[in-house]
Amino acid sequence: MTLFSFPNYVNWNKFDFIVLGAGISGIVLSHVLAQHGKSVLLLEKRNQLGGNCYDKLDETTGLLFHQYGPHIFHTDNQKVMDFIQPFFELNNYQHRVGLQLDNNLDLTLPFDFSQMRKLLDTKTASSLINFFQQHFPAEKHLTLMQLQTINFAPVQQLYQFLKIKVYGPYSVKMWGMPLEQIDPSVLGRVKISLSENSSYFPTATIQGLPKGGYTKAFTKMVDHPLIDLRLNCPANLISVNNNQLLFANQPITKPVVYCGLIDQLFGYCFGRLQYRSLHFEWKRYAVKQHQAYPVMNWPLHPTITRQVEYKQLTQEGLESNQTIVSCETPGAFREGDPRFMEPYYPLNDVSNNALFARYLKLANAIPNIHLLGRLALYQYIDMDRAIAQSLAKAEQLLQ
């Protein structure tokens, strides 16, 4: 691993592939290419690898935490499971999310029959559960959008609670716009469980976090003689001029896999794609455990969306009398803004998707560039899907 700047000390022309971005997508792709005998120059603008999955030990408490917010691995994809097996020894963590509301109820997400019994009086809860069992016997889940269409008073009572107290205010903060302006599909993806199964990832075959952390696992992936990893690389190493890909201002015909911001690649010629970002306030407490659940959602707080206690996720340092917690506040991504300087969630509304399509058309006109990852594809991508896409891209490039 080399920390000096590129390109002063490297002959990029000797590599079979150049990969820009050492997040989960770029790392997985580079590893697979190297395993098939291809040399890879892997470039990263940050001074660490792992993208937003990066984790490290806190200097004050000595506890492992995720610098860019919590990442819980989960998948039912066998190819993905086979790939991670040599690198991820998952702990036994099962994801749990608590709700901090304006009452003392101990509620968790996703909503299931047990949560309905806590929230509603006995008669209403029993009527609601019986209704679901009679009318949806084969369904495991219903979406919030489906609940909205059911003309039954207890269902509407549940729907209104979830919309007004839980998912509505959370979404307003998350996306920075009034509820009526948020794409209905956002709330439509929210599901309740029609059983006692409160699993946050009910379809996952495996879930958890890698013992020792993601950074340790990713470092192992890139520890290959055919991978040359360079950190602290300027983001503008790759540029485009008249449909010609330039690398360090020199024309290049080698295959380049680009995992960065697609609008930045083209100099923001059509304007900037919008993202939501997050600001983290870090707190340390001299206690073994600070909160009841690893993640506490705060839908009714004016600014904060959630609070995360990392030792409950990592299952490391549980006996320590110290703990580290992050409070997340969402905001609009603005380059150079110290609070919201990282692009996290693409704002996939009609106008931004149309803008992305224009940039994608430009990229498709360049034969030797390949887009990969959430920033290049302007998509929110779970970790297992990012790995699956990288495996598929590697297979395509090796043909």
UniProtKB/Swiss-Prot annotation:
Which residues are involved in binding FAD? Answer: 25, 44-45, 52, 71-72, 374, 381-386
Q: Which InterPro entries match?
A: UDP-GALP_mutase, UDP-GalPyranose_mutase_C
Question: Which residues are noted in the entry as UDP-alpha-D-galactose-binding?
Answer: 171, 175, 200, 297, 306, 345, 380
**Is Isomerase one of the keywords UniProt gives this record?**
yes
Catalytic activity, EC: 5.4.99.9
Family matches, as Pfam families? GLF, NAD_binding_8
What does the UniProt keyword field contain?
Answer: FAD, Flavoprotein, Isomerase
Q: Which reaction does it catalyse?
A: UDP-alpha-D-galactose = UDP-alpha-D-galactofuranose
What cofactor does its activity depend on? FAD
Cellular component annotations (GO), alphabetically ordered? cytosol
Q: Name one GO molecular function term.
A: flavin adenine dinucleotide binding
Q: Which NCBIfam families match?
A: UDP-GALP_mutase
Name the PANTHER family on file: UDP-GALACTOPYRANOSE MUTASE
The record's comment on protein family reads: Belongs to the UDP-galactopyranose/dTDP-fucopyranose mutase family.
Primary role: Involved in the conversion of UDP-GalP into UDP-GalF through a 2-keto intermediate.
What is the name listed in the Swiss-Prot or TrEMBL entry for this protein?
UDP-galactopyranose mutase
Q: Which organism is it from?
A: Mycoplasma pneumoniae (strain ATCC 29342 / M129 / Subtype 1)
